[in-house]
């Protein structure tokens, strides 16, 4: 667990009946995103593990709001991971008296949300103006690449193999 300089809240769901590997697949989609974005992504994710992960994120956001008095608009999913819980072992009967083992895996899902300051949003017009200014300055003085001037780093072109008429004559038969 990492210590943070931002105020945070934690929520855990233990013994969730989903494989940790499948939960991690969903968790990787939302790590580092805002809580609203994360819940929106999980709402439309087709994986079955998205529902319990969304519940834990919503619980962490509620903990942050109710227990710590944090603003829900500034909450970001800072840390989220799925650990392995106990595995229930079951038996599936198979042909000729055999029995195969079924592993019902569980996971412990932990979410830490932090209240981070909102980054200032730039308007589309200011972004266009900034890009236009950057392209003007780049057009005036093109920068030379340092590695392009040295000829020692380039590889010489490969020589093409030339077929001779003797090689093609002896190809078909044996002498």
Swiss-Prot record:
User: Low complexity bias located where?
Assistant: 136-154
Q: Where is the signal peptide, in residue numbers?
A: none
Gene Ontology cellular-component terms for this entry are:
cytosolic large ribosomal subunit
Q: Which GO terms describe its biological process?
A: translation
Q: Which PROSITE patterns match?
A: RIBOSOMAL_L22
Stretches for region Disordered: 113-175
Q: Which UniProt keywords apply?
A: Ribonucleoprotein, Ribosomal protein, RNA-binding, rRNA-binding
Stated family: Belongs to the universal ribosomal protein uL22 family.
Question: Which PANTHER family has this protein been placed in?
Answer: CHLOROPLAST 50S RIBOSOMAL PROTEIN L22-RELATED, LARGE RIBOSOMAL SUBUNIT PROTEIN UL22M
- General function of this protein: This protein binds specifically to 23S rRNA; its binding is stimulated by other ribosomal proteins, e.g. L4, L17, and L20. It is important during the early stages of 50S assembly. It makes multiple contacts with different domains of the 23S rRNA in the assembled 50S subunit and ribosome.
Q: What is this protein called?
A: Large ribosomal subunit protein uL22
């Amino acid at each position: 667990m990492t210590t943070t300089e931002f105020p945070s809240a934690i929520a855990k769901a233990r013994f969730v009946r989903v494989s940790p590997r499948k939960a991690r697949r969903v968790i990787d989609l939302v790590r580092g995103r805002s809580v609203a974005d994360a819940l929106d992504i999980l709402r439309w994710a087709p994986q079955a593990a998205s529902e319990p992960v969304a519940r834990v994120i919503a619980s962490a956001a509620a903990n942050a709001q109710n227990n710590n008095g944090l603003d829900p608009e500034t909450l970001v999913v800072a840390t989220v991971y799925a650990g392995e819980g106990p595995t229930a072992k079951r038996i599936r009967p198979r042909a000729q008296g055999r029995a195969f083992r079924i592993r019902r895996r569980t996971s412990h899902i932990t979410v830490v949300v932090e209240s981070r300051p909102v980054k200032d949003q730039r308007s589309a017009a200011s972004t266009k103006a900034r890009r236009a200014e950057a392209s003007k300055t780049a057009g005036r003085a093109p920068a030379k690449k340092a590695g392009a001037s040295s000829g020692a780093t380039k590889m010489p072109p490969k020589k093409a193999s030339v077929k001779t008429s003797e090689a093609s004559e002896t190809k078909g038969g044996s002498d």
